[in-house]
A protein has these predicted regions:
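N-terminal cap/lid segment of alpha/beta-hydrolase-fold proteins
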Residues: 1-42
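Short beta-strand element of the alpha/beta-hydrolase
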Residues: 43-52
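Short amphipathic alpha-helix adjacent to the substrate-entry channel of hydrolases
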Residues: 58-81
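Cap/lid segment of the alpha/beta-hydrolase catalytic domain
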Residues: 80-100, 252-254
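Alpha/beta-hydrolase active-site loop
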Residues: 94-128
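Short glycine-enriched nucleophile-adjacent loop
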Residues: 113, 140-153
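The feature captures the conserved acid-bearing segment of alpha/beta-hydrolase catalytic domains
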Residues: 158-240
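Alpha/beta-hydrolase-fold serine-hydrolase catalytic core, especially in secreted/extracellular enzymes
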Residues: 243-245, 251-310
């Protein structure tokens, strides 16, 4: 029985392959990533996932494993801000760490053939026509860049379009809103890249936010995490989760220390909602998403609610 009353497809045995290395002469070091996929599949849809600040390819198992068990190939890179990379604070790449993340995502899209070569057997094929993205926290901004989100460069006072036509849309989870006066002094001094604009983020997206996500980087409250929905053009949907803090019940990993609001039922809800949305977004089928919207249409629902705009 599912929380949202959707009919999940057959659960697959999954495989995970790491560490896959992609060479990029502009990066100084190889990009590394992990692929989690159904054991028995061909021509599968792809989810390109961006981890939060400091995390790595080993994070977010509760999401990646679920998506893979139910038909998606999930690709998780490790970005330069990861604690496992331990980039020096004076490294010249630090001020543009946000942009290096986006470049890594595009590198993966450029080298899908190489990734396929790492997979066992001859039958594995990635469906290039069905690619979506997702990210949590800082990773939501990274995913959003592929959808049209633009970051203000404080040195040039310009914004750059880094959207990618290969990506159909995505999911932004607990993602920061606009910067400027919304930021604390600490955030202004240490995270200058938290200056996104959502006005050009025109691709379809689902935004997920917790109504108890009090982020220390902003002078606003949890509504800051809802700005990617409210300040962007449609089509968009917003899932507001009651009682959820930044880890939204435990999506960042199994038994991870950073989870402050452990709630397996909430994680299960997010798994179901995101799976249904990806199926809708990539035109696999639409009944599951319609059922999710119906189940969470009432604000009196115990766990949260969904609203949408076109």
């Amino acid at each position: 029985m599912t929380i949202t009353n959707i009919d999940l497809n057959k659960e697959n045995t999954i495989i995970s392959i790491k560490t896959i290395k992609l060479h990029d002469s502009n990066r100084n070091t190889d990009a590394i990533l992990k692929v989690t996929a159904p054991m028995d599949w061909n021509n599968a849809p792809v989810i390109l996932f961006a981890h939060g600040f400091g995390s790595s390819l080993d994070g977010y198992g509760p999401l990646a494993d679920f998506w893979a068990r139910h038909g998606f190939v999930v690709i998780r890179p490790t970005f330069l801000d990861s604690r496992t990379v331990n980039l020096d604070s004076d490294d010249p790449r630090q001020p543009y760490i946000w942009k290096h993340r986006v470049q890594d995502m595009k590198l993966i899209l450029d080298q899908l053939d190489t990734i396929e070569d790492y997979l066992p057997g001859d039958h594995y094929h990635l469906d290039r026509s069905k690619i979506a993205t997702a990210g949590h926290s800082f990773g939501g901004q990274t995913a959003g860049n592929l959808l049209g989100l633009q970051v203000l460069d404080l040195n040039t006072q310009k914004r750059e379009d880094l959207s990618d036509s290969r990506v159909k849309g995505g999911i932004l989870i607990a993602t920061a809103g606009e910067g400027g006066d919304n930021l604390t002094e600490f955030a202004k001094e240490n995270f200058s890249f938290l200056n996104p604009s959502f006005s050009n983020m025109s691709k379809p997206a689902l935004v997920i936010a917790g109504d108890q996500d009090h982020n220390p980087l902003t002078v606003q409250g949890p509504e800051w995490m809802m700005e990617p929905y409210h300040l962007s053009p449609g089509p968009k949907s917003l899932l507001t989760l009651y009682g959820a803090e930044h880890s939204l019940g435990g999506i960042a990993g199994y038994e991870v220390k950073e989870t402050t609001d452990e709630n397996p039922e909430r994680v299960r809800l997010i798994q179901e909602v995101t799976w249904a949305y990806f199926r809708h977004l990539l035109d696999i089928e639409h009944d599951s998403w319609k059922q999710v919207q119906s189940s969470l249409a009432n604000k009196d629902n115990a766990m949260g609610y969904i609203e949408s705009k076109e």
